[in-house]
Regions:
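Short helix/turn-capping signatures at newly exposed starts of structured segments
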Residues: 1-181
Length: 181
């Protein structure tokens, strides 16, 4: 599996079980950290700008001695959205294990346009209908976690809507997407 990382892109496709934002699952922490350094625009404020994306503030968690930790990128507090999570990266054993993007409001909110714009299957992303994923994979609702999981045929993808089954709210929109190794 190719886990090279060269850039982080705010409109790169979502590849379930493979990558999101041009960040491959299984990329090494050191390679990711080196690429992150190229996107730093203000060291004092810990602001980063990815290709095609808004300015985001970074909070680092670890890594600890076992290589577990993560990164949380959020819109800065002075933005209309406040401190809204935009992208989280989970590191386990010194490699990327999960990538999650969050909707920053929904249209017509002005901040909705700052949300990650990558699409799965070339047509479904944040703000789309959850049911649009049914065009290329089964969805299983996890009652305990209150999210949808893709079918085995599609790769590991977790989709957040409104925390209820589609039968209860067929018009729910995608509020977060996570690719998992």
């Amino acid at each position: 599996m190719d886990a090279d990382i060269n850039s982080i892109e705010w409109d790169a496709p979502i590849a379930p079980g493979v990558s999101m934002a041009a960040i491959p699952l299984h990329a090494s922490f050191s390679d990711l950290d080196a690429v992150l350094a190229t996107h730093l625009i203000d060291a004092d404020a810990q602001l980063y700008r990815f290709e095609g994306g808004p300015d985001l503030r970074l909070e680092r968690y670890g890594p600890d001695e076992h290589g577990n930790g993560g990164f949380l990128f959020s819109l800065p507090g002075d933005d209309l959205a406040g401190d809204m999570a935009a992208l989280s990266i989970t590191i386990e054993g010194w490699v990327v294990r999960a990538l999650k993007v969050y909707a920053l409001g929904l249209p017509p909110d002005i901040v909705a346009g700052k949300s990650y714009r990558g699409l799965a299957g070339g047509k479904v992303g944040l703000g789309s209908l959850v049911s649009d994923f049914l065009g290329f994979t089964e969805l299983h609702f996890d009652e305990a976690e209150e999210w949808f999981c893709s079918g085995d045929d599609y790769g590991v993808l977790e989709i957040s809507g409104w925390g209820v089954p589609l039968e209860d709210e067929p018009g729910q929109v995608v509020t977060a997407i996570c690719v998992v190794a």
